[in-house]
Amino acid sequence: RGLGDVYKRQLYECQGDMILIDCGLVFPDADMFGVDLVIPDFTYVLENRDRIKGLFITHGHEDHIGSLPYLLKKFNVPIYAAKLTIGLIKNKLEEHGLASSAIFHEIRPRQKVTLGCFTVEPIHVNHSIPDSLAFAIDCPAGAVIHTGDFKVDYTPLSGDAVTDLPTIAEYGRKGVLALLADSTNAERPGFTATEQTVAEGVRRLFVKAGKRRIIVATFASNIYRVQQIIDLAIESGRKVAVSGRSMVSNTEMARELGYLHAPDNVLITIDEINKYPPEKVVLITTGSQGEPLSALSRMAQASHRQVRVGPNDFIIISARPIPGNEKTVTKVVNGLLTLGAEVIYENMYDTHVSGHACQEEQKLMLTLAHPQFFLPVHGEFKQLKRHADTA
């Protein structure tokens, strides 16, 4: 259960026991008037709550954790996730008054968890956020590999490791009943670019900015990208401020847990940015998807309380628009350009790389796992179909 789109939630059932994988949401299509969020139908889960042993989370992106508050209000299922993912979930649950009552179990790669007839082994994978996991799920019916969102980055950023292909291959040799694999980039040939590409692309843009203030918009959960920006700010002698509620809470949490490294003498508050000349400031902000109430959107509308955008600003949108968000992103870009800023967006420079496997990485996963059955997941039907064709 849970296939056919890009916001993820799956339920595995064997011999009367059940486990859940992920609990995501998506934003509505343009024609879904009056709808703020799209969440899963939890009816089957709630009807079988006594049989559900736990909920495993692959990583901390919205399309994998965003619906947790709505499930936990009705069913306080135990959550199994990596350390950073738990931190991101807690930030989200704080907004709903649920953080103190949620039941968390921290998991790590290669440390197996047995719940009912299921034995689940977390496997490290590369993605655009630290602590991303695949799961090998052993049960009486056989072994299932659930990749979650993944790519294979052979030159990962400092602190990360290459996707654990040997463990995938080990399961392949033993025998894999089914592989459920990320289909997001199934239409793209070749390999996904390394995160190192972004570091070099953004470094060139920092030079291009000259004496202007730099504003970088990215996903608040993209801890890798935030670290890259902080490192470049230090290289160029700039102070760093963050704007946007989720960006502030996530950066604070990631620093506390040791996933984000930023010296105290580099960080300043948003209220302090005007105390420094433009060439001494980098502002990291939310709003890369043109969200109406995000910090970057408010800047584009000249309604941000602390930031007034003008000709002295060099703005980098370090993310590609999620399908369906193109118009809102364009509106924000137009607003920023109207105010006199220079804006770098989409494919103008190497400011973003995908966190998802392209066709050659998908072939590698299929070859190593060597499953009896293959279920493409995490994609629109055309992507699922292309992934099936690749297999």
Q: What positions do the PLM features span?
A:
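C-terminal regulatory/interaction regions
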Residues: 231, 235, 254-391
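His/Asp/Glu-rich metal-coordinating catalytic cores
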Residues: 1-56, 61-276, 294-308, 327-331
